[in-house]
Amino acid sequence: MRPELALVPGEPAGIGPELCVRLVQQPREDCRLLAFADPDTLRAAAAALNLPLQLLPEDAEARVPGDLRVRAVPNAVPSHFGHADPANAGAVIGALLGAGQACLSGELHGVVTGPVHKAVINEGGIAYSGTTELLADQAGVKVVMMLANHIVRVALATTHLPLRDVADAITAPGLEHTLRTVHAALRREFGLAAPRIAVLGLNPHAGEDGHLGREELDLVIPLLQRLRAEGMDLVGPLPADTAFLPAKLAGFDTVLAMYHDQGLPVLKYSGFEQAVNLTLGLPYPRVAVDHGTALDLAGRGIADPSSLQAATTLCAQLARQRTLSA
């Protein structure tokens, strides 16, 4: 199976469009890409890079370097690299929702997304907290954020919260949903028959038997015991300061961190260029780059396409595996 994937560049004034141009310089055998984007922005990116780009109709086939099928989502005003315009917020959101709807309808099999500038979207009058939340709301599901590179996968029990709010946000129902979502995704999309998940403690030393916090004793341990009784292979709660040692990581398929900066610094240190962001729990695979819009680099031809390349390759793999698991 050769999955059909939506490719969404993200912020038109950032590096997303030029990364898409670089991506299609090698024809892909693992998937067919359909860009949801402003055609003029893609052409400008190709010109800035001095690379070939042939925008094709949706029913065409990409055969040579630079071929890219496009479903046009025009900007409201012309975009200029390095200068994000809130007037184009509607086009950015429209491209994301269009890609999501194409997957929900069964037309496409997955979505690969470039970086979006949250502040610019909100300045454009659209309440927006992130693409993860946008696509989850569209699909009517609760999702889990996972980041991954070639060394480790890290799922998050909470995402973008102030540290003072994290403990209150971790509840037994919420943590159970997260673990079930991660477990199901590892089976369905990664093809792991019996995934092993390491669960980090919230507190230093995983609470030190209640002396450094009781969340582990009162909430995490009882939940893990109950889910283990159902057959889930869960290890923990583990002290976060030693859980990422290579010898320990080798025994886990995924690590569940309780908050953003507990799990992600190690992942990004171990391979930021190859890191990608996955949304687990959607009816289709969505994989995003793990970097921002980099307005200061846009149009200069120096942005690294590694994360977008990794995201596209992984999304194609997940889409194929999901079909096999159906």
From Swiss-Prot:
Cofactor descriptive note: Binds 1 divalent metal cation per subunit. Can use ions such as Zn(2+), Mg(2+) or Co(2+).
Reactions listed under catalytic activity: 4-(phosphooxy)-L-threonine + NAD(+) = 3-amino-2-oxopropyl phosphate + CO2 + NADH
Residues reported to bind a divalent metal cation: 160, 205, 260
This protein's UniProt keywords: Cobalt, Cytoplasm, Magnesium, Metal-binding, NAD, NADP, Oxidoreductase, Pyridoxine biosynthesis, Zinc
EC numbers on record: 1.1.1.262
Binding site for substrate: 132, 268, 277, 286
Top-level taxon of the source organism: Bacteria
Transmembrane intervals: none
Listed cofactors: Zn(2+); Mg(2+); Co(2+)
SUPFAM superfamilies: Isocitrate/Isopropylmalate dehydrogenase-like
Pfam families: PdxA
Protein's pathway: Cofactor biosynthesis; pyridoxine 5'-phosphate biosynthesis; pyridoxine 5'-phosphate from D-erythrose 4-phosphate: step 4/5
GO BP annotation list: pyridoxal phosphate biosynthetic process; pyridoxine biosynthetic process
Keyword Transport: no
Function: Catalyzes the NAD(P)-dependent oxidation of 4-(phosphooxy)-L-threonine (HTP) into 2-amino-3-oxo-4-(phosphooxy)butyric acid which spontaneously decarboxylates to form 3-amino-2-oxopropyl phosphate (AHAP).
Self-association state and partner proteins as the record states: Homodimer.
Note: The active site is located at the dimer interface.
UniProt cross-references to PANTHER family, sorted A to Z: 4-HYDROXYTHREONINE-4-PHOSPHATE DEHYDROGENASE
Family assignment from sequence similarity: Belongs to the PdxA family.
UniProt xrefs under NCBIfam families: pdxA
Record-given protein name: 4-hydroxythreonine-4-phosphate dehydrogenase
Gene expressing this chain: pdxA
